[in-house]
């Protein structure tokens, strides 16, 4: 018989049944031992009452309770004795957040907010409290501007009782409003689910969407003109139901963490071109939808967003990576507000000019009264096309406080539309800034152009010459006022003052100066419509001086997601200012991006067979390691080559959707730090029932579980400090899980 003292942190076994009578609830105020059972449940004992655990041939005895071959892991936790340690807290735009250290033996925290519209502490939604493995984080959104906010973090015991004696409060925080300026807000419109003061509109519904519930989230909605309702399942289907136009209830869709195309069923996304789509029956279908990211890591990976028809839509605080076709496109949409978005590289298209993806933000099909503000474009190729050939009206679009960060062209390229471009930061643009084509009317005001080639161009005149930077050779008109041009920007710009015919822009001396009709585009003879001096057509706004734009746009409240997002990059101005090539290092970072989010606090999916709570997917080295490959390795021990495939197995009551495809390119590489018995769990969706290990095909047998749809190979001994490369065996396979059990020393 072996005796295990309380000095051990963790060990694990597998087996069958348990008999327990004297276990207690989890209590963070006491020193406890936790037995994690193979059915996923846990038993807790106070160490003051259980002085010794004994192990005898698979049977564990804790005091008077006996467990027969069914303990998957053992962990010990000391009683907490200090208050929650808050590591960071800040107020932002209509939101605030707090970060805090995690206790080993606390799985849930309640978080409260006070200030602004809350006179007393009010508990925030539990979905806003998340686990990042090494720390916890809570974000509060929908806040009024105010200087008196505080957040309070309270640990919750195993019996769901708050441990208020260990609660901590933040310092006083300031919250500011989003800037609601631009054509989207004309005639007192308030796009989205929020009021102008930042709080939710009356009766608004809130949906919290993660990669786990993207396909399963449900909402009851009005389906016809009689008021009948129906429950719709999945975010894409909920958006489709909005198209009918019968349910105009404001809806705030809050995105938590990263969502990839692998997380989305085909029914929830449209084509590669459209990605996730919100569509109205007509351009005046009232949507009242805000699609917003929570915190600084909300990301769509592999798809973009299309707004098709409809009015009153908003998208904010989300990152877009590896999207197909356009990152965001608007087609026939009115009163749309797209702001604080991080645009990274899309997937390469078939055309030569689509190596960084197609458009990042494109506006088409007679969209009008739209505002694009405080967005960050990271080396985008074709940044923003504004207008096609079909528009016949002015449309009225505004771009303000965007950070064009070493992007290439189309900032924006405007066809036919009337556009106000103000207070944007052109930071090392390599090809073309603002482009006027096909009768466009553009007012370019108080922007900062740092070493940007061709800051303003009119097709087939001025700096553009007769080459035509666009397919549409007709020109348009640009009025410029109050801009700062430095470096290359200043040397390539042609003002009408020096070039009265072959100019790049009419450079006004005052903001209210009208462009005379005698100034026309060389090709097409278009005159400027002077919309910016017509009070009935313009909105109220307050631009800062162009010299102040870089600090504002790159500051804490500036462009992009909160805290500038969880994926950031610093460009080398010496080389990147003039290059329109893909930045290989940035591309690798974008392709390899994954959030560090574990999950909503207390609802995390367990993907390992042991380990301390709050420690992520990889358990302590003494325990069993159960590594999943549900779109990425759950343990940092493993490196995957090739691609992932659908498997959909259920193993030990936990469902897994994806595994590593063991085809000609598939591989898993790892180097264990100790000796293990390795078990491979293969999905029966593929024919493979063996693999090659370092080039040699396995010969062990296994057992097929038809109900769980997996094949469990027999154990294979592997040795510490040895590199193992697993590849395809006799047939194409699908590796769903790898289980490593320590060899007893």
Where does each model-flagged region fall?
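Extracellular beta-strand/beta-solenoid scaffold signature
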Residues: 268-279, 301-304, 322-329, 350-364, ...
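Short, surface-exposed beta-strand/strand-loop-strand elements in extracellular ectodomains
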Residues: 686-698
């Amino acid at each position: 018989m072996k005796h295990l003292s309380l000095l051990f942190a963790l060990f694990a076994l597998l087996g069958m049944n348990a008999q327990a009578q004297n276990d207690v609830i989890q209590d963070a105020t006491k020193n406890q031992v936790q037995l994690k059972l193979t059915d996923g449940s846990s038993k807790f004992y106070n160490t003051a009452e259980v002085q010794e655990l004994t192990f005898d041939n698979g049977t564990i005895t804790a005091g008077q309770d006996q467990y027969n071959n069914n303990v998957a892991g053992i962990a010990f936790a000391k009683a907490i004795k200090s208050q929650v340690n808050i590591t960071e807290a800040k107020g932002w735009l209509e939101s605030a957040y707090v970060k805090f250290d995690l206790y080993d033996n606390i799985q849930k925290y309640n978080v409260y907010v006070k200030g602004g519209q809350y006179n007393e502490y009010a508990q925030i939604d539990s979905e806003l409290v998340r686990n990042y493995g090494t720390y916890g984080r809570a974000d509060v959104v929908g806040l009024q501007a105010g200087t008196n906010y505080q957040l309070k973090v309270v640990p919750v015991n195993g019996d769901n009782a708050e441990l208020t004696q260990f609660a901590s409060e933040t310092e006083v925080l300031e919250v500011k409003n989003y800037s609601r300026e631009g054509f989207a807000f004309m005639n007192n419109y308030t796009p989205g689910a929020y009021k102008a003061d930042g709080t939710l509109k009356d009766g608004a519904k809130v949906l919290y969407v993660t990669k786990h519930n993207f396909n399963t989230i449900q909402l009851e909605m009005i389906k016809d003109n009689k008021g009948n309702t129906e429950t719709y399942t999945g975010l894409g289907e909920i958006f489709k139901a909005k198209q009918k136009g019968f349910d105009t209830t404001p809806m705030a869709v809050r995105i938590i963490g990263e969502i990839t195309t692998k997380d989305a069923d085909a029914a929830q996304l449209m084509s590669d071109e459209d990605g996730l789509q919100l569509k109205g029956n007509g351009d005046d279908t009232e949507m009242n939808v805000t699609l917003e990211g929570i915190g600084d890591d909300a990301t769509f990976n592999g798809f973009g967003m299309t707004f098709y028809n409809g009015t009153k839509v908003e998208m904010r605080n989300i990152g877009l990576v590896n999207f197909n076709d356009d990152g965001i496109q608007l087609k026939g949409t009115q009163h749309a507000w797209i702001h604080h978005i991080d645009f990274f590289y899309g997937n390469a298209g078939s055309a030569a000019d689509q190596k960084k993806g197609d458009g990042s933000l494109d506006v088409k099909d007679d969209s009008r009264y739209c505002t694009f503000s405080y967005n960050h474009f990271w080396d985008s190729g074709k940044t923003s096309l504004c207008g096609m050939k079909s528009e016949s009206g002015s449309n009225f679009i505004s771009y303000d406080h965007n950070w064009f960060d070493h992007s290439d062209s189309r900032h924006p390229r405007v066809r036919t539309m009337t556009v106000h471009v103000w207070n944007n930061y052109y930071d090392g643009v390599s090809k073309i800034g603002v482009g006027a084509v096909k009768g466009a009317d553009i007012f370019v005001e108080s922007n900062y152009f740092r070493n940007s080639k061709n800051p303003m161009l009119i097709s087939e005149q001025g700096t553009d010459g007769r080459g035509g930077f666009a397919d549409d050779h007709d020109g348009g008109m640009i009025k410029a006022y109050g801009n700062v041009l430095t470096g290359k920007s200043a040397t390539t710009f042609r003002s009408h003052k020096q070039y009265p015919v072959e100019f790049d822009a009419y450079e006004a001396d005052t903001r209210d100066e009208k462009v005379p009709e005698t100034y026309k585009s060389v090709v097409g003879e278009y005159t400027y419509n002077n919309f910016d001096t017509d009070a009935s057509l313009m909105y109220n706004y307050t631009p800062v001086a162009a010299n102040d734009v870089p600090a504002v746009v790159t500051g804490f409240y500036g462009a992009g997601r909160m805290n500038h997002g969880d994926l950031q990059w610093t460009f080398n101005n010496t080389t990147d200012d003039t290059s329109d090539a893909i930045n290989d290092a940035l591309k690798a970072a974008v392709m390899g991006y994954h959030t560090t989010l574990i999950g909503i606090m207390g609802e995390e999916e367990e993907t390992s067979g042991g380990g301390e709570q709050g420690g992520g997917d990889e358990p302590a080295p003494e325990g069993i390691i159960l590594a999943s490959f549900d779109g990425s390795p759950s343990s940092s021990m493993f490196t995957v080559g090739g691609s992932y495939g659908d498997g959909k197995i259920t193993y030990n009551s936990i469902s897994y959707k994806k595994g590593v495809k063991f085809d000609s390119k598939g591989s898993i590489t790892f180097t264990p730090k100790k000796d293990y018995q390795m078990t491979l769990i293969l999905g029966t969706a593929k024919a493979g029932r063996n693999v090659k290990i370092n080039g040699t095909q396995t010969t062990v047998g296994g057992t097929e579980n038809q109900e769980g749809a997996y094949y469990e190979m027999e154990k294979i001994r592997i040795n510490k400090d040895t590199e193992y490369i697993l590849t395809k065996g006799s047939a194409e396979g699908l590796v769903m899980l790898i289980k490593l059990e320590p060899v007893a020393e």
